[in-house]
């Protein structure tokens, strides 16, 4: 594909996520080219690296982006800043007809997990990429819910403390709220809960995710196992380091010994446990930072699909 057939994108946020995303766009994208890297710190490594790669840069935030000579050619913008800043960025970008891919927990637009529901949101002006834990675990909840009624789903995302920058740490509450909501709306569980753990271990460990689903006792275990395996393969198509750590596990919770689930009460049934690991591609970030890699990989997959639809519609 020639450069003229690619759509220009801007990345707002020159930190770890924004810089890794820029490298992915330049190395791996089928339909995108870098139009701008936007930050607020003139001395940031992300802006310096972008400048060395020939990408237009500005350290004046969204105002600087709009003032760039090539802003009129930018069709898609990634926001890799914070939930608090996103609303203002989105307002400006929508006025100029720029599609927005939100990597913060702001969730102004619909939640999108590429392998689950991207197709139905291609025309949305703003899509939200949920959270790193959501990108890793909600596909599994959806895989189970395709086979059985999921009365409750709980996910635990354990990430290396070193991979959690100031943006992640400032958005812990938004992480749990956004992920919990998407477990229900995208994963199709009746109730959802999300927990994040910052693991201080040295050397740093890769992202680990655990998914628990409560389904009816007579659910088809083999069908659930196969559905989960198929979903893992689908996610790994755009996140190569995404994998099952062990086979899907099933535990019967008998009627005579129910467990108490907050918000639901005492329940029995079949507990489905899925254990995942996410290794980063190490384009810019360390391999242990799978939590950041899955966000940038999912965002790139979504943007490429959106760009392909826009190019086709020309």
UniProtKB/Swiss-Prot annotation:
Q: Which Pfam families match?
A: AcetDehyd-dimer (PF09290), Semialdhyde_dh (PF01118)
Report the EC code(s) recorded for this entry. Answer: 1.2.1.10
Q: Which family does it belong to?
A: Belongs to the acetaldehyde dehydrogenase family.
Q: Does the keyword Oxidoreductase apply?
A: yes
Active-site positions on this chain: 132 (acyl-thioester intermediate)
List, alphabetically, the HAMAP family matched: Ac_ald_DH_ac
The GO biological-process annotations, alphabetized, read as:
catabolic process
The GO terms describing molecular function are: acetaldehyde dehydrogenase (acetylating) activity; NAD binding
Protein known as: Acetaldehyde dehydrogenase
* Keyword annotations of the record: Aromatic hydrocarbons catabolism, NAD, Oxidoreductase, Plasmid
Write out the catalysed reaction: acetaldehyde + NAD(+) + CoA = acetyl-CoA + NADH + H(+)
């Amino acid at each position: 594909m020639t450069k003229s057939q690619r759509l220009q994108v801007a990345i707002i946020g020159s930190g770890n996520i924004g810089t890794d995303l820029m490298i992915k766009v330049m190395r791996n994208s089928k339909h995108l080219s870098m139009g701008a890297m936007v930050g607020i710190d003139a001395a940031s490594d992300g802006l310096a690296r972008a400048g060395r790669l020939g990408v237009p840069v500005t350290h004046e935030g969204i105002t600087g982006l709009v003032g760039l000579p090539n802003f009129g050619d930018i069709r898609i913008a990634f926001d890799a800043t914070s939930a608090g800043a996103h609303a203002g960025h989105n307002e400006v970008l929508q006025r100029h007809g720029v599609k927005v891919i939100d990597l913060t927990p702001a969730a102004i637009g619909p939640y999108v997990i590429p392998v689950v529901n991207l197709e139905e949101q291609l025309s949305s002006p703003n899509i939200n990429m949920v959270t790193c834990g959501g990108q890793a675990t909600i596909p599994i909840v959806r895989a189970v819910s395709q086979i059985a009624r999921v009365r409750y789903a709980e996910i635990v995302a354990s990430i290396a403390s070193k991979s959690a920058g100031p943006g992640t740490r400032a958005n812990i509450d938004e992480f749990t709220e956004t992920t919990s909501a998407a477990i229900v709306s995208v994963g199709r569980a009746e109730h959802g809960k999300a927990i994040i753990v910052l693991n201080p271990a040295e050397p740093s460990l890769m992202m680990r995710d655990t998914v628990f689903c409560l389904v009816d006792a007579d659910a088809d275990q083999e069908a659930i196992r196969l559905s989960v395996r198929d979903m893992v393969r689908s996610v790994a198509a755009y996140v190569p380091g995404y994998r099952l750590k062990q086979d899907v596990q099933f535990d019967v919770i008998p009627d005579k010994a129910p467990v108490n689930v907050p918000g639901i009460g005492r329940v029995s049934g079949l507990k489905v446990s899925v254990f995942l690991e996410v290794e980063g591609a190490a384009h810019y970030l360390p391999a242990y930072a799978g939590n950041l890699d899955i966000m940038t990989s999912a965002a790139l997959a979504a943007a490429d699909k959106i760009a392909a639809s826009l190019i086709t519609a020309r």
